[in-house]
Amino acid sequence: MNILTLILSYLIGSISFALIVGKMFYKKDIRDYGSGNLGATNAYRVLGIKAGVIVAIADILKGTFACLLPLILSSTINPIVCGLLAILGHIFSVFASFKGGKAVATATGVFLFLSPLGVLVGFVVFVLTLLFTKYVSLSSMLAGIALFIYSLIFEDKVIIALSLLIIVSIIILHRQNIKRILNGTENKIV
């Protein structure tokens, strides 16, 4: 059951809701539009707010669901491992030639299971940053940093380590966005 749990966690993470929503309902492969990223922000920019919200919610839920798999399947695998595999699946999707999204929403779903109050803190930072700057990328990075700071204060060492790993990954995956922010060429959300 443990191997099945691990495989399913990765495969669930690999499901690209941005690709599915784009192809099924809009007849568009969003990899060919906008940033080409298989995430909620590109879905929003290419397909509209409704699609962006649906993709964001679905990506969050898949992160949470992956963490629930050990409970559902009576597995001894730690939910953190399942969450990490879902995040890796989102970034390196087997269903999309190992090219996925930046996993911000999927990581949010994982932390919704592990640290709901930490996610609330991150969400507040995300919304405030987005309201003031209109940069989704900056909002995502600052929300991740806020979650890490929350974890340092209130969570155990494993959650602290995971939140550090996630924020470092998010920043690395957003390095082109950081360059564009510094150059003043990053797209703002309208």
Curated annotation (Swiss-Prot):
Subunit structure comment from the entry: Probably interacts with PlsX.
Membrane topology: Multi-pass membrane protein
InterPro entries given in the database record: G3P_acylTferase_PlsY
Gene giving rise to this polypeptide: plsY2
Segments traversing the membrane: 1-21, 53-73, 76-96, 110-130, 152-172
Protein name, as recorded: Glycerol-3-phosphate acyltransferase 2
Pathway entry: Lipid metabolism; phospholipid metabolism
Reaction catalysed by this enzyme: an acyl phosphate + sn-glycerol 3-phosphate = a 1-acyl-sn-glycero-3-phosphate + phosphate
Gene Ontology CC terms: plasma membrane
Enzyme class: transferase
